[in-house]
């Protein structure tokens, strides 16, 4: 979600070299900060990866402007290759560093594999761009070759044979998912967003297969298995129905009944047995026992149900306003769309403070519900398909240019990923010290508070625009200030947070991510929490 001055946007092919350079400068600042903190051969690989991604990004941008890319990408943004390429490698580096400090060699190696996998899929995206660019850019190829050679050489001497095979497995899955999903979902992603989303899905799928084949009794937390199975199950379900409805009219009652029946068959016949094998107990009974285990969980579930009802009422109210409006193209204003950010903040903060495992599972269930409802809307499944199309069209923006509406799913992911990605085995009593204690709040701070306040103040009072963008200086400054106030409130209400005088790093992290929000054209609901998570965990 973005904040804008009331001025016309540049066309999709308009060059935004100033904003792209500023975005790159912010990303390089993050990379160098992590490099200075970690300072090992893997962080040097991250620097080399960032340099080649910076040069290749311009080739992707030219391909998008000329319409020469292999697939149809979202045209209202630049390629976003540089910021997306660095997320998985940097995340792996900070995870490795934290687990090394905690004396957990297994998850230290896991962090290295995450970093190596992120570098592999990023290099593949760069090679793809140069392979379809005509004439072949010799200088950029040399830079890519040098950076890739350094990374491959270091990883060859750092990874075991099994780890190399794991990286190659993820890369293979990533290639196939790119070919399938980018064909089925034109204009839903930029190259960078595809790299980030499909790379993450590929890694999750490979982890699930690996853990299913090497299962050991009592190994792993059931909530982790629950997340893996739900994500993979929903993706495979979407691919199955997309292929099926190529040959069927999805809008008929017969197809709708078949959709619901097949959903039940896949859930009861594939997903639940798969989860049962992993957790060694009845998944439904485990979930019910988990959700209603304590009085605190019952109170939180009741509170969240009220907030969900409130969100539905907001949607109904905005659609009622559209029905009474003379314009058929009435769109919800920026402030109305930010209501959902405030509702999500009110949802996540009590969960983080009182019961993070419950929030972990509840966010997973909510993700499955959101994706399922998007399938119903996309395939026009009766009886809710057309209703959802009408209701959700009110909240579209320029980033929902493809057949899928992903903004609300990205918002949920941005808030949930800091909860899901905490390396719990490498923490003391489930929390980290210093600035790292704010890691679970990264989504709340970056998107729930920062982006919301920036949008409201930037669109209503903003006058001074950042060069090359529609974002405003006033919006960014109020965003930083609001996040600082939020950190102070977290210190007051969450007794488990001890910042240990790391205030300068927190301020720098918040300011850096706010500047990234000002210049990026990617999905900030997803990108900003990940960068704030990386900086806070470093």
UniProtKB/Swiss-Prot annotation:
Identify the metabolic or biological route this protein is part of: Protein modification; protein glycosylation
Residues on the Cytoplasmic side? 35-74, 133-134, 185-188, 246-254, 319-337, 381-401, 458-472, 517-538
- Cite the record's tissue specificity text: Ubiquitous.
Q: What class of enzyme is it?
A: transferase
Superkingdom assignment: Eukaryota
Q: What topology does it adopt in the membrane?
A: Multi-pass membrane protein
Is Lipid metabolism set as a keyword in this record?
yes
Q: What is this protein called?
A: Dolichol kinase
Task: Report the source organism.
Answer: Homo sapiens (Human)
